[in-house]
Regions:
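Conserved SGNH/GDSL esterase-like catalytic core that processes O-acyl groups on lipids
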Residues: 25-29, 35-116
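Bacterial N-terminal signal peptides
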Residues: 8-17
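A short hydrophobic/aromatic micro-motif that marks alpha-helical segments and, especially, helix-coil
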Residues: 17-18, 48
Length: 116
């Protein structure tokens, strides 16, 4: 099984294993960079992966999109996610489940000046 397909199955397994009999909707916080935000799609509001996840999960879930284009996982990166407004919004959302997709922008040479 390729890695991407495994990741999708893992996320769905975690989300779907949450009890469906909960009294209030289960909140899923999608935290990440431009991929989470939906950059490159015609309409991130409907075509980003968090929007697609909301459609798949239905009304028993509330999926929040807290993607920030260019965000890094590194605290000393060129755009640390924890210093972005989306981070605080994600914390205030207080999701029951978090899907984190960060790290792509951490390969930026600005964040590794001593690497040769």
């Amino acid at each position: 099984m390729n890695k991407k397909l495994f990741e999708v199955y893992l996320v769905l397994l975690i989300i779907l294993s949450t009890p469906l009999y909960a009294k209030s909707p289960i909140k899923v916080a999608c935290i990440g960079n431009s991929i989470t935000f939906g950059t490159g799609t015609e309409n991130p509001q409907t075509e980003s992966y968090p929007a697609q996840l909301q459609q798949l999960l239905g009304h028993n879930y509330i999926v929040g999109n807290f993607g920030k284009p260019g965000a890094t996982l590194l605290k000393r990166g060129h755009r640390p996610y924890t210093l972005q407004p989306e981070y605080q919004k994600a914390m205030n959302f207080a999701g029951d489940i978090a899907v984190i997709h960060l790290g792509i922008n951490d390969t930026d040479p600005r964040d590794w000046p001593n690497y040769r």
